[in-house]
């Protein structure tokens, strides 16, 4: 059975939808990560607040490697993550879901890999299709079933290594 984790971004801070929630601090080789573990319809789900349980960690200080490693330690096999973003596409309306299938990461201030030669050696990872198509299909089908507007393709551009938001340009 696959174990699912949700990583909540700005606006998604807690696992209130889960029952029998317990909080755990997971110690990883990269630091600590705080997780909430609970149940939804009998299935164990892990919730991790990207900005911390009290939303006190700004974007440029998030310990992504500790967070992902903690989920691995908890035997999570699938991750769904939310993020608060703006869009240049006027077809996207507030409240609609854009299920990105590509991304460009232009940030430079964080270590974005486990394969930098220090921890796991050096590896080259194919990022042609960086997201799990099976999980994407499940989300698309659930959206259709529940009449949620989902745009099945999109590219997310990460540019800011700080809490700064976009400009009008």
Residues of each region from the PLM?
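Single conserved hydrophobic/aromatic residue that forms the stacking wall/gate
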Residues: 158-169
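Metabolite-binding pocket within alpha/beta catalytic cores that recognizes anionic/polar moieties
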Residues: 1-127
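Short Gly/charged-rich anion-binding patches and loops
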Residues: 66-69, 134, 138, 164
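A generic "cationic amphipathic patch" detector
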Residues: 60, 152, 163-165
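Active-site rim beta-loop-alpha module in soluble metabolic enzymes
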Residues: 130-160
């Amino acid at each position: 059975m696959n174990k699912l984790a949700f990583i909540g971004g700005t606006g998604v801070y807690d696992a209130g939808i889960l029952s029998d929630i317990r909080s755990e601090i997971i110690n990883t080789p990269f630091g600590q990560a705080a997780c909430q573990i609970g149940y939804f319809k009998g299935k164990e789900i892990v919730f991790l607040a990207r900005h911390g349980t009290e939303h006190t960690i700004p974007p440029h200080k998030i310990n992504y490697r500790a967070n992902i490693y903690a989920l691995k330690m908890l035997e999570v096999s699938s991750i769904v993550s939310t993020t608060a973003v703006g869009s240049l596409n006027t077809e996207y309306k507030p409240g609609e879901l854009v299920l990105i299938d590509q991304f460009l990461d232009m940030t430079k201030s964080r270590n974005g890999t486990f394969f930098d030669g220090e921890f796991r050696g050096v590896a080259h990872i194919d990022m042609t299709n960086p997201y799990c198509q099976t999980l994407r299909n499940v989300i698309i089908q659930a959206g259709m079933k529940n009449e949620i507007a989902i745009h099945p393709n999109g590219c997310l551009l990460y540019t800011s290594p700080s809490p700064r938001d976009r400009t009008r340009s």
